[in-house]
Amino acid sequence: MRQHAPIKAPRIFSSLPGWPRDAVCCFLLIVLSVIFLHKVVFLGKVLLPADLLLLMPPWKSHAAEMFPDFHRVYNPMLDVIQQYYPWRLFSSTWIREGVLPLWNPHMFSGTSFVANGQSAIFYPLNLLFCLMPVKLAFGWTAVMHLALIGVSTYGFLRCILARRVAALTGAVAFMFCGFISAWLEFTTFLCTATWLPISLYIFERTVCRHSSVASDPTPPSRFYVGMSLTGLSLGMALLAGHLQIGLYVWLTFGAYAAYRMISVGSVIPGRSQERARTPTRPHSPGRFLSRVVLAVMIGLFVGAPQWLPVMELTHFSTRAGEFRLESIWGARLTVTHLLTFLVPNFFGNPVDYNYWGSFNFIELSGSIGVVALLLWVPALVALFRRKADRCESPDSHQQTGFWLALLLVSMSIAMLTPLYYVFVHCIPGFAQLRGPARALLMIDFSGAVLAAHGVEALLRRVDGESRRALHRATLIVAGLLTGVMMVGVLFLAQEYLSDFFFSYGMRQLAVFAWFLVVGVLLMRRVSQRPSNNGNAYQLPSLGSPAMLAYFLPVLVAVELFVADMRFNPQLDAEMVYFDTPSTRYLQEDPSMFRVLGIGTSFLNWLPSNTLMSLGLEEIQGSDSLWTRNYAGYLNDVQPGAPTFGWNSQLSPRLDDLNVKYVLAPPNMGLEPPPGELILDGDLRIYRRPHPKPRCYVDDGRALEYHWLNPNHLRVQIGEGSAGDTALHWSNACYPGWQVWVDGQRGNLRSRSEVVQTAVLPAGSDRADIVFYPTSVKLGIFLMCLAAGMVSASLARGWRGRLSSITQQSIARSTSRRRMVSATER
């Protein structure tokens, strides 16, 4: 069969060489990320659900006066304002002082902060929180990472595809997909997901260069540089703060590396397409594997300061134990929720206060838009007709097959099929993960790559029969999608049928139908033959198929903007933890103490972690990982803790926890009262009569102490005792604490779950209690080792580059002298 030439892409920037045109595309992606969060960039809004605080004491009492336009919460994303903001505020405050906060004294009577994977204290890009106000940094971090996602996805797709419009379409589909948009304010999810396309881009660029032709070989030193940078990006995925998402990044990379190890001898139709006719260099799979292992080692070593402490805490946490299916069954991606791939708001939206899905909206968000789904059709048609259509690149079919297979595997993980158990038994720690639907990250990325392959297939000139097959398949798929949607409406959503023409549901269906029809018509027009009679140097007309192809990424962007742009609250900065009389009273108390917050309902109390933003310490907390020993102790005092429904505020065990104040909402009376009511305003503050001091000796004498930093407590013993005595310190027990008495290493042991004890020799004057666990020491050592490996690779690559430049310079000089000699003769 005669081989057909591809449709030439329009020369919109015909006067520019290749890289400036790529730069223009990347600039457009950055502009889109700015538009998506324009209120943050241009209006100074904060990307935080700060209005949730206006429903909680003590801020609730001042909401009407300070924010008269406030009527209801925009989108109740509690974890962002309850967890992420206090953690970022705490870490950035101490990093500005030159201290890495390894311990957090503000939650759970003290807990390991570095082992809280979402603290991300080693993640370099979190320095932005230290350079500007934390509440503003949330928005700018999102803009930066959203732009990085778009640019790196575009770069990766340019490596594996020939056409810029295809790469642009895939980049837009992924950077604004449902997963990224829904988790945008959860910084650890966003930051970790960013390194998926970055790692694949560096890896693929390295492999493409290395597997190029013998006339332009890549020196082995530069291959090592590429693999080292790949490992560095994989390590960043571990440092960014969410190990589950990081694991999905690593799974995707591992699968793709295995695929490329098999196909490394073939040239993908990207930037080396013009050299594809020259024979490629032979490769040894073993040598290729060894260099991939180098990248994996560097990635593990770079991320070691984060994942080693997390694994240590996991061993002691409430999640330790056997895998329990019932604990994650409700968080799976159900068959019915696949309808949200077509209509993202099929089950409503929290912003509209009408969500009725089976689980959390954010956990199940993963749409890339119906237009992107339609673009799968030409890619799959080209895959299944690869023998009939002898296209220019057989490897493009291999790529399509790989990403289709990865998408199906990801779906099986998200939907808790039996394949999920394979990962549970083969990957350490996988059984303790929650939220299987978070595999939507891999689903969305695979779907975006398939959409890009679809655009590539649309622009490939094929014979009339293949084009007709594509048109038929597109119409059939569009009909099937419409049928599936109608079945879902009839059996699941009776609300769609009430007030038929004016209901919320019908508006969503109308949006779906519009993009479906426009997408089908645009794809049909793009797949036609070009109208410039094959003259590649003639600028196509505005209505030509090649020019219309650039409307595909525009259509994908418009659809995703319509679905997702309004989801994330962008609010006034003044709402974020503003001062009140009660918070000022607590902050002005010079003593060291802990507090207990109680209430009557989920919103009518001072939630755990919020006090951390005020610099106060509490015995409860909110985190996915905390030690089971402390959880057992706290639940012995109050079953179900941490909770607002606390009725054991008179328990003597609170004395051991150094609880000085009990905080209750203003409309809540406590009988009997836990202590003296000293303030009755926007909070009711009770002072308990006899809390034990934080540090004391055997005879009960309180010791003076202060935190030098979160990792270092200094205790002044004062008047020495006639003989040895014991120092008792109220702190949740955790491995990694060391005590130094007058400069000599002492022995610190646990007396109970919440009290640690050290022997003080007679005449002791000072004790320093320091938190520096072995997991952190080992992790930092491995990170330094990885830094050395990367530096050595870069130095080797630079020497190779200098040597190459020198040889080229010598060759040019020799050639010039020969030409001069020949001219003189």
Predicted regions and their residues:
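Extracytoplasmic
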Residues: 328, 558-701, 710-714, 718-723, ...
